[in-house]
């Protein structure tokens, strides 16, 4: 399959082309700012689908709106018309097409050229009036406020907010690309106007607050709920703006004669992740909890866990090592300890169901002793 992508070097174009390359069996024919409009008839000569993403939204001169949007689209329509084949065509318009400003008028005129083309030769035309698109490879001070805010906040550059309560509608680049590829695959209806879902609404102030939370998480170690929805998309976008020299950061490390203890990640309501080491023969723990629980995973070395019920005196012992993927849980009301019974340093991953609170640690020293 051969696909023409106009605006292939733009924000949406780069993401789309990356996904098309992953698919395999698709040859991308790129059209960029360096390409000649006069070459369009040759470029589309044998293509099976057209993604028309090229356009102008922040020109140096107002007349460039018309040149880069409506006139370019008209030239593309003429090339398709002269080709004689009903090549399916997808166009990225804008919600600004509903507004009577120079940008909106130029995008609406482009839509009209495409609609006429579809009526004249019967080619499927898919028009997406996109709101603010955000994601990796977007340009600050050009594509969206999200890009600008991410770029600045991650570099400690002040951002400007004129109206913090102003609402903006966002769509994530991966959702845009996934929807576009469904159209190419014939999995969406042959409608003239389509939408990318989901769409997110957020105020400018809330957006900035969320991005600052991402920045501060490196110091607090507390991560937001970045696994789904808008927060996931914003976090991925935020990280895509990291300069290379900021790809890593230090976390607290506490060392003593027993070994080291490192806090890695905290959550608002699902506990925290850490790891610790212990030298041969070293025992850690010797305490119990009323409500706090933990999961231990030995990554390296040999460990002996001992447990004693503080009420009944019942005793239990578990031995495990780094060769086994085995979780050992601590149980409320059972005092417990862990001993390195090997000859090398032991490394253990640890999850606790709550973030450590120095004022209320729910940790009470109590020797485990030995079993009967």
UniProtKB/Swiss-Prot annotation:
It catalyses: UDP-2-acetamido-2,6-dideoxy-beta-L-arabino-hex-4-ulose + NADH + H(+) = UDP-2-acetamido-2,6-dideoxy-beta-L-talose + NAD(+); UDP-2-acetamido-2,6-dideoxy-beta-L-arabino-hex-4-ulose + NADPH + H(+) = UDP-2-acetamido-2,6-dideoxy-beta-L-talose + NADP(+). Substrate binds at residues 132, 279-282. SUPFAM superfamilies: NAD(P)-binding Rossmann-fold domains, RmlC-like cupins. Pathway: Bacterial outer membrane biogenesis; LPS O-antigen biosynthesis. It is an enzyme of class 1 (oxidoreductase). The keyword Transport does not apply. This is UDP-2-acetamido-2,6-beta-L-arabino-hexul-4-ose reductase. It comes from Pseudomonas aeruginosa (strain ATCC 29260 / BCRC 12902 / CIP 102967 / NCIMB 11965 / PA103). The lineage of its organism: Bacteria, Pseudomonadati, Pseudomonadota, Gammaproteobacteria, Pseudomonadales.
